[in-house]
Amino acid sequence: MLGGLGKLAAEGLAHRTEKATEGAIHAVEEVVKEVVGHAKETGEKAIAEAIKKAQESGDKKMKEITETVTNTVTNAITHAAESLDKLGQ
């Protein structure tokens, strides 16, 4: 009789252990999903910020280059006009 009770108790303990393990696995899966979601979101924000800074830097460089080219062309035209004016005098 006690052997049957021991076997029944062992089966009950095994069943409770299995259910507890399944619950723990489910909880860990949820935590992992949440952590991965936060990591993905953080990574996406970091990439977006890096792209934004690169674009701003590129825009600034393009503005500087445009100003330099404009000034160079303006100076060349002014110099040419002054030279032509001197030739005409």
From Swiss-Prot:
InterPro entries: FAM25 (IPR023243). Pfam families: FAM25 (PF15825). It comes from the Eukaryota. Belongs to the FAM25 family. PANTHER family: PROTEIN FAM25A-RELATED. This is Protein FAM25A.
